[in-house]
Structures are given as C-alpha cells and as structure tokens.
Amino acid sequence: MDTKFSTAIHMLILVSEAETPMNSDQIAQSVGTNASYVRKVAARLGHAGIIGSRGRSGFCLLKAPDEITFLEVYRAVEETDHVHVFDIHQNPSDACIVGRNIRPVLGGMFRHAEEVVEDELAGATLADCMARMREEIDRNSHQQEGKRQ
C-alpha cells in the first residue's frame, strides 16, 4: 500500500480548514511531499467529485466534510472499487500440500478482513477525522501548557 490515501485525507483536512484556498505547493509543504504528487492525488479526488480547483489559487471541497466517507476517498485515490490490503505470493508449489491450498485459504480469509476494513472506511467521514484532529490539537496544546508551568 502506498501513501495516496493518507495524503488525500491530509489534503482534504487542509483544504476544508483553510480560510483561503490552498495551492499544491502549500499542501505539499504540510504533507511533506512534492507539489506534483499533490496534484496527482488532487486530480483523482477531482475526478471523483470530492474537490475542485479554483484555477491557480487553490483547491476547494465540493461536498461537506460529513458527506465525504473514507471509503469514497480510498476508492478515488486508489482507483478501485474494492479495498485491497493483502497480497498472496504468486507461485506456491503444487507439489506441496500447503502450496496447493494456501491461495484459496488465505484468499478467503484476506477478503473477509478487507470487507471489515471496507465497512469501517464506509462509516468514517472526513468530519469524524477533523473532530479527532481538533481533540488531538487540544490535547497537545494542553500538554505544552503544562510543560511551560
């Protein structure tokens, strides 16, 4: 798994919380990547109708944060309809009893786990993540205040 999904969530929070539109250079600085990668992720989010571009001035959300599910974001940036977390090695030996049976056994177990992940992503919204972010910021600011005293 690569980092497009977490990058997309980071971007969407920034765009949602910014008082003025943020461009790809500003987002890239916060994410810790380059602007071309941000534009690549943004293009996928744009095709999915999640964000729009305001010319060179920056990006804007096209939906309210409580209407954007993590599953929708995942599907947009990974360009797939199914959550894919696990891979199975490709060439197990048919001469071995385990090798002959490992792919169907693990395939079923892995698909079940991916369905659970998919359900969790479908139930989580950008607004949920933003609320947790605010809690984390508040907790960290209180910890910093305690250290100063």
Give residue ranges: language-model regions.
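Short acidic, hydrophobic short linear motifs in intrinsically disordered regions
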Residues: 20-28
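C-terminal regulatory/oligomerization modules of transcriptional regulators
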Residues: 90-149
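Basic amphipathic alpha-helical segments that dock to polyanions
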Residues: 42-48
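Short alpha-helical segments that sit at the start of domains
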Residues: 1-11
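Conserved segment of winged-helix/HTH DNA-binding domains
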Residues: 65-91
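Short helix-capping/hinge SLiMs at alpha-helix to coil transitions
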Residues: 15-19, 63-64
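Beta-hairpin "wing" of winged helix-turn-helix
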Residues: 48-56, 60-62
